[in-house]
Regions:
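N-terminal glycine-/serine-/threonine-rich beta1-alpha1-beta2 phosphate-ribose binding loop
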Residues: 1-76, 88-103
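Glycine-rich, acidic and aromatic/proline-enriched surface loops and short helix-turn segments
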Residues: 60, 166-167
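A contiguous active-site-proximal alpha/beta segment in oxidoreductase catalytic domains
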Residues: 76-78, 84-159, 163-166
Length: 168
C-alpha cells in the first residue's frame, strides 16, 4: 500500500483474485486511470508496455511464477517474502535478473530497521566482540489465537478460486 502513495508513482493496474477486495477499490478511487485485473498474467499482457515496476503480494506459492513472468517482460520487481519455495527457483530468478540487468528486491522490511542496522554495524566493526550466544524474543504475538481449523464455508463468488490456487 505504501508504494502507491509515493508522489512519483503512477499506478496503472491492480490485480487480485478476489474482485471485491476492499483495498483495491480504495486504490482505484485514487488512481482513476488504473485498471483492475483478476489474473496477473492478463494484467502483464495488457499493461506490459505501461509498466516499469511490478510489486507482487500474491499468495506465497505464486511468487515465483508471477515474478518470473514480470521479469521476462523486462520489469523490475519487488516481491514479498518468501521469494520462492525452492532454492533452485530463487537462484533462477537471481540469475535472470542479473542477466537482464533488472532491479529486484524481496520484502524483508524488519531487517532494514535501525536496531538491526546498528547491531550489524557493531558486529562488523568488532565493537561488541565475538558473539557466543544470542537470545531472541518478540513483543508481537505471531501465533494464531483463533480456532485450530477454519470452519467450512463456500468460496466467495467474488474470488476466482483457481487463480488464487495458482501452482498450489
Amino acid at each position: 500500500g505504501e508504494l502507491v502513495k509515493h508522489e512519483r508513482v503512477e499506478a496503472v493496474g491492480f490485480c487480485d483474485a478476489d474482485r471485491n477486495r476492499g483495498q483495491i477499490y480504495s486504490w482505484l478511487s485514487k488512481h482513476k486511470s488504473a485498471k483492475f485485473f483478476q489474473d496477473y498474467r492478463e494484467m502483464l499482457a495488457t499493461l506490459g508496455d505501461k509498466v516499469d515496476v511490478v510489486s507482487i503480494s500474491t499468495p506465497d506459492h505464486t511468487h515465483y511464477p508471477a515474478t518470473m513472468a514480470a521479469m521476462k517482460l523486462g520489469k523490475h520487481v519487488y516481491t514479498q517474502k518468501p521469494l520462492t519455495h525452492k532454492l533452485a527457483e530463487a537462484r533462477e530468478l537471481a540469475e535472470f535478473a542479473a542477466e537482464k540487468k533488472l532491479t529486484t528486491q524481496m520484502g524483508i522490511q524488519n531487517q532494514s530497521r535501525a536496531p538491526y542496522r546498528f547491531t550489524r554495524h557493531h558486529i562488523k566493526k568488532g565493537i561488541i566482540g565475538k558473539i557466543k550466544k544470542v537470545y531472541v524474543w518478540s513483543f508481537k504475538n505471531w501465533g494464531y489465537d483463533g480456532k485450530p481449523f477454519a470452519e467450512k464455508s463456500a468460496v466467495p463468488e467474488s474470488l476466482d478460486w483457481n487463480l488464487w490456487l495458482g501452482t498450489a
